Curated annotation (Swiss-Prot):
GO terms for biological process: antibiotic biosynthetic process. Coiled coil: none annotated. Phosphotransferase that is responsible for the production of the 3-phosphohydroxyasparaginyl residues found at position 9 in the non-ribosomally synthesized calcium-dependent antibiotic (CDA) derivatives CDA1b and CDA2a/b. It is not known whether the phosphorylation reaction takes place before, during or after peptide assembly. It holds the Pfam family APH. This is 3-hydroxyasparagine phosphotransferase. Pathway: Antibiotic biosynthesis; calcium-dependent antibiotic biosynthesis. Keywords: Antibiotic biosynthesis, Kinase, Transferase. It is an enzyme of class 2 (transferase). Its EC number is 2.7.1.-. One of its GO terms (molecular function) is kinase activity.
Length: 300
């Protein structure tokens, strides 16, 4: 999770020179400008390529795996055009962990992980439509990208998070949910959605994978708790799916894992806003646990 202190923008510094040089090696025509984003994991530099606005994303050495997944995703997009608008790729290099792409005109839907400003119905509807289109996309090459849910749940269980009853319920719910089979963005915060030319465009594909159905919906549900009507609208999307194997069961597995990660991250923060948010996350955790039991009871 990023905080404001993690991200710095402005003119490139001397420390950025080596990473910018990698971008220019990969895309010699790229003319770098100001730093758009800087953190311990990556550097994103705005600039131009042949008169077109562009972005160069360069991962720091310890975080190159994330860049590889995003490059692999663009390879999928080239092989099988995605059902949602995405920025064009101009150049990339796996060894250098560099990706140069189109810089979109427009603005992100919300800069904060947990939006505190209203999200319009049109924007939320556009994001949900993109999620729906994406889940029906079936690029064959993504078959090896299935997430190991059993392994993740066992890792959480090893931390002493689940009591015996909760653990048994989750294993049963996972069994009933079937195998991961839905291509998902994987990090669908509203800062990763740009409103550009009347469309909602998804950016930053470093966490894309084959998930259980409803991963992106579960993340939106968790993050948009303060946006009036958002959770109810998302739950309509879940309920409209064909059956429990595509609907509520996998949604709750995804939500449990996301809430665990988010609650753990919030333990590091001591500001009043984060403490208040942690209370809300704890309430969402208990609600989700109750709904897991409820879902299994109705499943028979």
């Amino acid at each position: 999770m990023k905080t404001e202190s993690d991200v710095q923008t402005g003119a490139p510094t001397a420390a950025d020179g080596a990473l910018i040089a990698l971008a220019r090696e990969v895309c010699p025509g790229f003319a770098p400008g100001e730093v758009v984003y800087r953190s311990r994991t990556s550097l994103v530099v705005g600039g131009e390529l042949d008169g077109v606005e562009a972005l160069a994303k360069v991962r720091t050495p310890d975080w190159r795996r994330q860049c590889l997944r995003e490059i692999d995703t663009y390879d999928l997009f080239d092989a099988v055009p995605p059902p949602v608008p995405v920025p064009r790729r101009f150049a990339s290099d796996r060894e250098r962990a560099v990706l140069v792409m189109e810089r979109l005109t427009g603005e992100v839907l919300a800069p904060d992980r947990f939006p505190v400003t209203p999200v319009s119905r049109e924007d939320l509807a556009g994001v949900l439509e993109a999620v729906e289109r994406l889940r029906h996309w079936r690029p064959a090459a993504a078959g090896a990208w299935a997430v190991d849910y059993r392994g993740m749940l066992e890792g959480v269980h090893a931390q002493g998070v689940f009591d015996d009853g909760h653990w048994a319920d989750l294993l049963r719910l996972l069994e009933l949910s079937g195998a991961p089979r839905e291509f998902g963005h994987g990090d669908l915060v509203l800062a990763n959605v740009v409103r550009s030319r009347g469309r909602q465009v998804l950016i930053d594909w470093a966490s894309s994978a084959l998930y259980l159905p409803g991963l992106d919906l579960a993340q939106l549900w968790m993050l948009l708790g303060d946006v009036p009507g958002a959770r109810a609208r998302i739950e309509v999307e879940v309920a409209d799916r064909a059956d429990d194997r595509d609907g509520m069961m996998p949604f709750l597995v995804n939500l449990t894992l996301l809430l665990y990660r988010e609650r753990r991250a919030h333990r590091r923060f001591t500001d009043d806003a984060s403490r208040a948010r942690a209370v809300g996350l704890d309430a969402a955790w208990e609600l989700t646990r109750h709904r897991v039991r409820q879902c299994l009871a109705t499943a028979g």
